[in-house]
Amino acid sequence: MQTTKNQDDLVRIFKAILKEERFGSQSEIVTALQAEGFTNINQSKVSRMLSKFGAVRTRNAKQEMVYCLPAELGVPTAGSPLKNLVLDVDHNQAMIVVRTSPGAAQLIARLLDSIGKPEGILGTIAGDDTIFICPSSIQDIADTLETIKSLFNYAE
């Protein structure tokens, strides 16, 4: 058994372990990683990795609470282009709606709020995968819409 393995191996095996959907505690994950040869792994490292990769506790097919990585979430990383998280941009006479990948709406809304009024955005409300954008001026909603579309390289 190897005593040290590199970070890429750790990440790959960590994700594979979570896909099994059978580990209900962080200590069980630590034990499984140690069995794979990662002797320097501990609970705090596992906790940080669970956070980093967006792992959640959910019920598996046997109704047991286990850690898993939601497949559809597509957890944004520092290297993820934000434009890939925006799925649709639409509007009516008063509001702009942006649909995102699940879990990405608050990240995108925060970005939109940061550019704010100079770009025609009065404010945003974000759920899990939908953002409502209130334009600064209804008369200029078309300009605000174009600003948002260009920000995310969105083309219909």
Swiss-Prot record:
Q: Which domain of life is it from?
A: Bacteria
**What InterPro entries does the record tag this protein with?**
Arg_repress (IPR001669), Arg_repress_C (IPR020899), Arg_repress_C_sf (IPR036251), Arg_repress_DNA-bd (IPR020900), WH-like_DNA-bd_sf (IPR036388), WH_DNA-bd_sf (IPR036390)
Q: Name one GO cellular component term.
A: transcription regulator complex
Q: Where are its TM segments located?
A: none
Biological process terms from the Gene Ontology for this record are:
L-arginine biosynthetic process; protein complex oligomerization; regulation of arginine biosynthetic process; regulation of arginine metabolic process
**Alphabetic keyword roster:** Amino-acid biosynthesis, Arginine biosynthesis, Cytoplasm, DNA-binding, Repressor, Transcription, Transcription regulation
Compartments annotated for it: namely:
Cytoplasm
Broad class of where this protein is predominantly found: cytoplasm
Pathway participation: Amino-acid biosynthesis; L-arginine biosynthesis [regulation]
Extract one GO molecular function annotation from the record. DNA-binding transcription factor activity
What biological function has been recorded for the protein in this entry?
Regulates arginine biosynthesis genes.
Q: Which family does it belong to?
A: Belongs to the ArgR family.
Identify the PANTHER family for this entry. Answer: ARGININE REPRESSOR
What is the designated name of this protein? Arginine repressor
